[in-house]
């Protein structure tokens, strides 16, 4: 929970993780971290009036040959109505001159 607040403070809008979920495996479906990331009141499933452009991509695979660093992210999201949609993130390395 504290980590997700820090991620929000940093201004992260597109979160990509190599885990099955950003929430605890057994949280009784509360999805606390998802709610924090999307500014949804805990215990509620009502989305705020403002549309969030934040995304979470779980279960990504990044080969070991990809170095830590700064990248541009191009994310392809299928036009899909629902609470989850498949995506295809592509990263491009940035060189700081």
Predicted regions and their residues:
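Active-/binding-site microenvironments in catalytic and ligand-binding cores
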Residues: 1-97
């Amino acid at each position: 929970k504290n980590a997700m607040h820090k991620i929000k403070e940093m201004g992260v809008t597109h979160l990509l993780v190599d885990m099955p979920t950003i929430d605890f495996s057994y949280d009784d479906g509360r999805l606390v971290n998802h709610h924090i990331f999307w500014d949804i009141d805990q215990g509620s499933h009502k989305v705020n009036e403002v549309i969030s452009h934040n995304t979470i991509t779980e279960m990504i695979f990044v080969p070991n040959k990809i170095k830590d660093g700064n990248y541009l992210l191009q994310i392809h999201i299928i036009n899909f109505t629902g609470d989850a949609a498949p995506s295809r993130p592509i990263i491009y390395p940035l060189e700081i001159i």
